[in-house]
């Protein structure tokens, strides 16, 4: 029996990415955290990436933000994996990023930089607590 792994209401050509962070309690800097990203596609496939360790936690806002370079590197890694899985259509029409934190201008710039010249629109959504 074939299993349909298609996800409901997921658009073809869109690369969905969820960002999560884990603070590193034993680090010398209380802002130190690890970022991870889960990419999933319309066919139900998913891949988890470990992003960079760094001072991503902002105690004043209690949110996590990558710097521009780390955001660009993470998005570039995701896009590279997308290309491996879609050799006939190597760039997604849209990179849809969601996280519990808002996106800083610096972080957003890194995501946009990674998509520059690829015809990929970047969309971000902050997930609010219910």
Regions found by a protein language model. Give the residues of each.
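Long, contiguous domain-sized segments
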Residues: 1-130
């Amino acid at each position: 029996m074939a299993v349909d792994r298609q996800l409901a209401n997921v658009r073809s050509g869109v690369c969905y990415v969820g960002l999560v962070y884990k603070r590193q309690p034993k680090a010398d800097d209380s802002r130190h955290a690890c970022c991870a990203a889960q990419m999933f596609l319309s066919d139900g496939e998913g891949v988890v990436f470990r992003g960079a360790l760094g001072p991503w936690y902002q105690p004043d806002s209690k949110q996590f933000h990558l710097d521009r370079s780390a955001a660009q590197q993470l998005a570039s890694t995701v896009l590279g994996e997308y290309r491996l899985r879609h050799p006939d259509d190597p760039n997604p029409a849209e990179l849809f990023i969601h996280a519990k934190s808002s996106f800083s201008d610096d972080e957003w710039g890194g995501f946009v930089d990674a998509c520059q010249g690829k015809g990929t629109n970047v969309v971000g959504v902050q997930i609010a607590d219910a």
